[in-house]
Amino acid sequence: MNTLDFDKRPEDTRIVVAMSGGVDSSVVAGILKREGYDVLGITLQLYDHGAAVHRAGSCCAGQDIDDARRVCETLGIPHYVLDYEARFRETVINPFAEAYAMGETPIPCVACNQTVKFADLLATAQELGADALATGHYIRSRPNPVSGQPGRRALYRPIDSDRDQSWFLFATTQEQIDYLRFPLGGLSKAETRALAEEMGLVVAKKADSQDICFVPQGKYTDIINKLKPNAALAGDIVHLDGRVLGRHDGIVHYTIGQRRGIGVATGEPLYVVHLDARGRRVIVGPREALETRRVYLRDMNWLGDGALAADAGQGFTCFAKVRSTRPPTEAVLHADENGIYVDLMTGEAGVAPGQACVLYSAPGPDARVYGGGFIDRSERSVDAEASLKALLEKPVAA
């Protein structure tokens, strides 16, 4: 077996590398080239507007495409650029705006992976005769002998917990996992940068992207207001107890768990606990009203060894992560007549519809990823649920 688990020599193994123009995917290409694989670099042009084109680290725009080209020249591998702007707008940007308009907090990186990178680009790699598509994500995959199927693989958290991207990859299907390779899963970010320096790559000191790639300067509201003007319509800021505390300029400016910048001063700390898109209301309350013990999931992607109904029918003990910045905590997954839901042993605050609940075998590095789903709704304390229900059933004043 070679280092990518193929039973043939590296030089007889063709690998397409998804190159964003950043240091991570560039080092992946360098590692595979150094190991003797037949490497092709492909960059997707996903958008081309305003400041994002000239902003280094924005991913898959003008400057980054040029950086990917220069890296491929240094490594001596072919580089291709594919125009996916229309596809990206249709499957990522438009749904992103629609979700915010409905009071959700979407994860565009997941949509991009599932509709562009791990669907369209993966299909292109197969058409080019590649044995695998490699990316610069910090996650691991290994053969899964328990499955009893040749070529079947499982996902695991990476060694570098600070760079763990497994939460964003929960929706990766089993067929995609079997075809993908993640060479950086066993490296730290510092080791990746050291390799980039050693290889003489122009991106060795390039800063990491911190924003949503298609949102210049982090101003996501500009895009949403352009595509979904109704999301910027004014409405009331309402306390859970029914008091109208003030006005807002659009629910798009708020997210569940937010405390700062709410726009009201009452002498008590208040948090956004619900966004009522239909009534154009931002509902606020005390921090204890945020504590969530159960989340209901939609679009579940189960990556366990058995069928979901069999594994979770009587409750499946695992660890759940409901926010990208939070560690996994003890949980139980259920799949029964009430739907698919996760009971959290420790209450979590700031759980928002549209975000993900991702399941693991353990809380630490190298834990297996069991998949997950998008959060459809959540249950809080009995008092908070009752207050919210009563408020939502109350007619909104014209």
UniProtKB/Swiss-Prot annotation:
GO molecular function: ATP binding; tRNA binding; tRNA-uridine 2-sulfurtransferase activity
Pfam families, alphabetized: tRNA_Me_trans, tRNA_Me_trans_C, tRNA_Me_trans_M
Covalent S-S links between cysteines: C112-C213
Record site: Interaction with tRNA: H137, Q355
Cellular compartment(s): Cytoplasm
EC number of this enzyme: 2.8.1.13
GO biological process, one term: tRNA wobble position uridine thiolation
Keyword annotations of the record: ATP-binding, Cytoplasm, Disulfide bond, Nucleotide-binding, RNA-binding, Transferase, tRNA processing, tRNA-binding
Positions annotated to bind ATP: A18, M19, S20, G21, G22, V23, D24, S25, L44, G136
PANTHER family: MITOCHONDRIAL TRNA-SPECIFIC 2-THIOURIDYLASE 1 (PTHR11933:SF5), TRNA 5-METHYLAMINOMETHYL-2-THIOURIDYLATE -METHYLTRANSFERASE (PTHR11933)
Functional note: Catalyzes the 2-thiolation of uridine at the wobble position (U34) of tRNA, leading to the formation of s(2)U34.
Protein's UniProt name: tRNA-specific 2-thiouridylase MnmA
Organism: Agrobacterium fabrum (strain C58 / ATCC 33970) (Agrobacterium tumefaciens (strain C58))
